[in-house]
A protein has these predicted regions:
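Glycine-rich, acidic
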Residues: 1-91, 95
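Glycine-rich, small/acidic residue-mixed loop/short-helix segments
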Residues: 63-180
Length: 180
């Protein structure tokens, strides 16, 4: 799902269904497992931890499959498809969407990512404090190919903070959450 966790979608019979009764039943049944209700903010944190990109937030029509690390899903052996010529011409380029870890600050949207020498290299598209990882994390858009870069600075309202630039997802690459 949107959070990178294993889950379920429930469908109902409409008028013959009580969402409130189901909600109460699930909370009661989950007490032993310490199930609690949460909100969209917790889902947002999990989305970032899982490295799940959101169209319109983390990327838009300016990005191609190479920029997003999705080239393995392109069948270049196929005789033709819309955009094939442009993708072949561009060639395999490094990803422009990466992650950052910032132990001293919670990154927020539009915070500026800089190289260690202060050059602007990108910006935060989604950020949060990760209770699981005990650090600030963010998805960042890089202005150009910086796949080999591993350290940088984050300019926020509170100052400049050291960050580690990393691949996504931040953890659970095999999508095993919840762990049995």
């Amino acid at each position: 799902g949107w959070t990178g966790e294993k889950g379920f979608e429930l469908y109902s019979d409409g008028d013959n269904f009580s969402g409130e009764e189901l909600w109460n039943y699930l909370l009661e049944a989950g007490k032993e497992e310490k199930l609690i209700a949460s909100d969209i903010a917790s889902m947002h944190i999990r989305r970032i931890e899982a490295g799940i990109l959101d169209y319109g937030t983390d990327f838009d029509q300016r990005f191609d499959p190479f920029d997003l690390g999705l080239q393995k899903f392109i069948d270049f052996d196929k005789s033709d498809f819309i955009g094939k010529e442009a993708l072949v011409k561009k060639g395999n380029s490094p990803m422009r969407i990466r992650g950052i870890r910032c132990p001293s600050e919670k990154p927020v949207v539009d915070d500026e990512l800089q190289s260690v020498d202060g050059k602007v290299i990108g910006s935060v598209t989604a950020g949060a404090w990760s209770p699981f990882l005990e650090t600030g994390i963010a998805i960042v858009q890089l202005n150009y190919d910086l796949e080999s870069l591993s350290e940088g600075k984050l300019r926020t309202n509170s100052g400049i903070h050291d960050v580690k630039i990393c691949d996504l997802p931040f953890h659970d690459k095999e999508k095993n959450i919840p762990i049995d």
